[in-house]
Swiss-Prot record:
Name assigned to this protein: Chromosomal replication initiator protein DnaA
Disulfide bridges in this chain: none
Assembly: Oligomerizes as a right-handed, spiral filament on DNA at oriC.
GO biological process: DNA replication initiation; regulation of DNA replication
Xref: SUPFAM superfamilies: P-loop containing nucleoside triphosphate hydrolases, TrpR-like
Top-rank taxon, per record: Bacteria
Compositionally biased residues, Pro residues: 90-108
Binding sites annotated in the UniProt record for ATP: G157, G159, K160, T161
SMART domains membership: AAA, Bac_DnaA_C
GO cellular component: cytoplasm; plasma membrane
Keyword terms, alphabetized: ATP-binding, Cytoplasm, DNA replication, DNA-binding, Lipid-binding, Nucleotide-binding
Stated role: Plays an essential role in the initiation and regulation of chromosomal replication. ATP-DnaA binds to the origin of replication (oriC) to initiate formation of the DNA replication initiation complex once per cell cycle. Binds the DnaA box (a 9 base pair repeat at the origin) and separates the double-stranded (ds)DNA. Forms a right-handed helical filament on oriC DNA; dsDNA binds to the exterior of the filament while single-stranded (ss)DNA is stabiized in the filament's interior.
Keyword ATP-binding: yes
Length: 456
């Protein structure tokens, strides 16, 4: 593929994503041409290869389609190390060491301050955090070059610390010679106080000013601490001038941190400021699923969904709720169920009305009638398929706020067909004992009052 066409592809992509995403994932790509009818793009590593394939292959194919390609195909190829180096910006020249600066200590274990549980591999990406994740990965790929400093803010328990440690692990893996230091602002302050008291400020400064990556959590606690702000200001300058990467986290953006010196606030805004929001339902379910798999817990999808609907605040509470349900099930020797989960969480989280979605109903009906959901939504007209379809449409109308046209669209039918199905089920209730029992059982399940495996 010519570079002109490739430039058009990138132009299309750039219009449809954020600048952070573009510079993180697309700017480094290498056009390797067309092979066997597929556009082949060179990437840095297998992580980027898999991420691009999952997240952006469709966008690239749309770009090719917009340029006239009939059946566009895109593949990603990991480049050899020698070619990979061509994708990264060259290292900036190191700043001269100031006269009298103490020599850096010899390299130590560069992961000693990192939590081994927090890596990119077990960080669940969703719409609430995709930009922060992309920025963190860009920094990990090119420390000191991409965004410096990287400032991540958001409420407690949303994954800021996880991302910071993930960057540390990634850099430690790729650059074992790099010195990495993670510290909370409270610890930094306490260590400074001790250093002043014991006349060890030189050692303190050398420790934090000789690192290649400095990760500082809860930087908002610098507010009001004049001596700590003064020390951190000079630490920041020393690292920045030597092109060392700085990542900061906070519960608010720099402009909202009261009693923070203006010179620090302006420096915090030099790089990229990105936030993490509370995860939406699908991301919460994915987080629970990953946590359960990591701990080798076999728990039904519907139970995970109930927990995700019940706990909407932050990830820590979400994971805590999962462990509470697991403990409740184990201690009471009862299998996992929606009812068990509701009871386990009832004394901790305020009960919330569970919002039932159309797919929830379809899934339950499919399970009850032992039939794939796609078959129920399909065009089959035999009684074995029609009855479950009518029951699903009846329950969706009964348990959700969706209109007849919306239900019809979900099933690929018009609203009059749905109206007929609902009337048919309504007419048979009380007459057909088998149908009545099925509807009542499914209704109780959807309200979380009964589970197909057990009852609490």
């Amino acid at each position: 593929m010519s570079q002109e066409i490739w430039a058009d592809v990138l132009g299309y992509v750039r219009k449809n994503i954020s600048e952070v995403e573009y510079h993180t994932w697309f700017a480094p790509l290498k056009n390797l041409g067309v092979q066997d009818g597929s556009l082949v793009l060179g990437v840095r590593n297998s992580f980027a290869q898999e991420w691009l394939r999952k997240q952006y292959q469709g966008l690239l194919e749309d770009a090719l389609r917009s340029l006239g390609a009939q059946h566009p195909q895109v593949s990603f190829q990991v480049l050899p190390a020698s070619q990979d180096a061509l994708l990264l910006p060259s290292d900036p020249p190191p700043a001269p060491i100031s006269p009298g600066r103490a020599p850096a200590p010899p390299p130590a274990d560069n992961r000693k301050t990192l939590n081994p549980k927090y890596t990119f591999e077990n960080f669940v990406v969703g719409p609430n955090n995709n930009l922060a994740h992309a920025a963190a990965l860009a920094v990990a790929e090119s420390p000191g070059k991409a965004y410096n400093p990287l400032f991540i803010y958001g409420d407690v328990g949303l994954g800021k610390t996880h991302l910071m440690h993930a960057v540390g692990h990634y850099i430690a893996e790729r650059f074992p010679e790099k010195r990495i230091e993670y510290v909370s602002t409270e610890t930094f302050t306490n260590e400074l106080i001790n250093a002043i008291r014991e006349d060890k400020t030189t050692q303190f400064r050398n420790r934090y000013r000789s690192v290649d990556l400095l990760l500082v959590d809860d930087i908002q606690f610098l507010a009001g601490k004049e001596r700590t702000q003064e020390e951190f200001f000079h630490t920041f300058n020393a690292l920045y001038e030597n092109h060392k990467q700085i990542i900061l986290s906070s519960d608010r953006p720099p402009k909202d941190i009261q009693t923070l010196e203006g010179r620090l606030r302006s420096r915090f805004e030099w790089g990229l400021i990105t936030d993490i929001q509370s995860p939406e339902f699908e991301t919460r379910v994915a987080i629970l699923k990953m946590n359960a798999e990591h701990n080798r817990i076999d728990i039904p999808q519907e139970v995970l969904e109930l927990i995700a609907r019940q706990v909407t605040t932050n990830i820590r509470e979400l994971e805590g709720a999962l462990m509470r349900v697991v403990a409740f099930s184990s201690l009471n020797n009862v299998p996992f169920s929606r009812a068990v989960a509701s009871k386990a969480l009832s004394n901790v989280f305020a009960p919330q009305e569970v919002k039932v979605e159309m797919m929830d109903v379809l899934r339950q009906v499919a399970s009850h009638f032992n039939m794939p959901p796609d078959v129920i939504r399909g065009s089959g007209r035999v009684r074995e398929v029609v009855v479950p379809r009518q029951v699903a449409q009846y329950l969706i109308r009964d348990l959700t706020d969706h209109s007849l046209p919306e239900i019809g669209q979900f099933f690929g039918r018009d609203h009059s067909t749905v109206m007929h199905a609902i009337s048919k089920v309504t007419e048979q209730l009380g007459k057909d004992s088998e149908l009545t029992a099925a509807v009542e059982t499914l209704r109780r399940k959807m309200k979380g009052l009964e589970d197909e495996d057990s009852r609490a």
